[in-house]
Amino acid sequence: MILIEDLQTTEAGNRWANALKLLTVYGLRPVELTCLHVKQTPKGKKYLFCSYQKRSGRGLTKPRELEPLPIDGTDWKLLSLFEAGLLELPKLSAEGNGVAEQIRKYLERRSAWISLKAKVAARNEELGIYSFRHSYSVRGHRAGIDSGSMANAMGHSLDVHNSEYPYSTNETTQSAFDRARNLSVIT
């Protein structure tokens, strides 16, 4: 949140902050910023849709409905702003690794990003462009969303999710079993 707030001091900074908000709230790959659309269910519920299809050795990922996971309840009204054409984004090139590279280059010149990277490095952790996407996975699991649902929301298979987004630790395993035991006592 501090990083996003720090960027919002200029028009260009606002556009980049909007991109980071989308990456974080919807768990997007950077390139997916160029493939967003608003759609509507038959019952009239509007949602953000990603038409991107990632090619891999396992085939193509499917376009998908995006599920927001706000940070501390803050969703920045991204869907309504996007639909109204009021969510300005930087000009992004979807060629190759262009979007991720553009975001990386922009952030590497920002003092808030440099400071945040140093704090993360002091904990022997890494901070990169995909950290916004990774935080989506962590928030989802902490909220009790199962791995299969998180994988589907993020546009990859359960196998990929489990290998690339290992969430389970001794602490999370203990919490999961504590919750299960508490549920069985209630029912």
Where in this protein do the model-derived segments appear?
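Conserved tyrosine-mediated DNA breakage-rejoining catalytic core shared by Y-recombinases
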Residues: 35-77
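Catalytic-site neighborhood detector that most strongly recognizes the C-terminal catalytic loop/helix
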Residues: 52-56, 154-179
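Extended hydrophobic-aromatic, low-complexity segments
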Residues: 59-61, 78-81, 130, 147-152, ...
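Intrinsically disordered, low-complexity basic tails/linkers immediately adjacent to helix-turn-helix/homeobox/MYB/SANT
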Residues: 179-187
